[in-house]
Regions:
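Phosphate/nucleotide-binding beta-alpha loop and adjacent structural elements of enzyme active sites
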Residues: 1-224
Length: 224
């Protein structure tokens, strides 16, 4: 790691986010507080976080990590994965986009580390163009979630908690996972104005019921 990248990581984690201060929660809407009550944290579990963005800020899996859980963090932003590699070296961290097929996709963001980065053109218009926000476009590689899992040490392992937050690409992420193999017990997903019906129908078809609702986030539980 070069010295400039190391400085940016330290500045972000210790000066901006104050990593050294342990918190009761890290999520933006209280998702992790609900999960902490719902999940048996005495048992070590396996999570997958797609659109992980930051290991501390607005993060739904940091509390799980602190309680011995381990998993996979995925983000299309390179700096996001630099942060995860620094803070969570025991996780597997992948700098890649997730879609319903392996392909090259256009990725839009306004700055180096943007929580609103998106590959969805409807979201781009709503959150960037209509608000006169400047953005940059670049072409990046996308794989299916199945492909990432198959090439990880968790191949074939049931997912205890799946978190998806990819600004309008959430439905494509869901479709990229084999639910007969990985069978997530709990799913947290943002449902905004894009693909709401498709997401709800998909989860209902796969026997999930909604058990918690925030401003944008929704948590679903697998019905046995």
């Amino acid at each position: 790691m070069n010295i400039i990248k190391f400085f940016h990581i330290i500045h972000n984690l210790y000066f901006k986010q104050k990593y050294f201060i342990k918190r009761k929660y890290y999520s933006s809407e209280g998702e992790d507080l609900f999960l902490k009550e719902k999940l048996n944290l005495k048992k070590k579990g396996f999570y997958v976080d797609v659109g992980a963005y930051h290991p501390i800020r607005h993060n739904n899996t940091m509390i799980l990590y602190q309680n011995g859980w381990r998993g996979i963090n995925i983000d299309a932003n390179e700096f996001s994965i630099d942060l995860f590699n620094f803070i969570r070296p025991e996780d597997e961290n992948f700098n890649i986009a997730i879609s319903d097929k392996s392909e090259k996709i256009d990725f839009y963001s306004s700055k180096k580390h943007d929580p609103q980065s998106t590959a969805n053109k409807i979201f781009l218009k709503h959150d960037y163009i209509d608000k006169n926000r400047k953005y940059k476009k670049k072409e990046i590689e996308a794989k299916t979630l199945n492909d990432v899992l198959k090439n990880s040490k968790y191949n074939g392992q049931q997912i205890d908690f799946l978190n998806i937050d990819v600004q309008g690409y959430d439905y494509k992420v869901l479709k990229s996972l084999d639910f007969k193999v990985y069978k997530p017990k709990y799913i947290c997903i943002e449902i905004q104005f894009i693909n709401e019906k498709e997401i709800m129908d998909f989860l209902e078809y796969n026997k999930y019921q909604r058990i918690w609702t925030g401003i944008n986030s929704n948590i679903f539980e697998k019905i046995e």
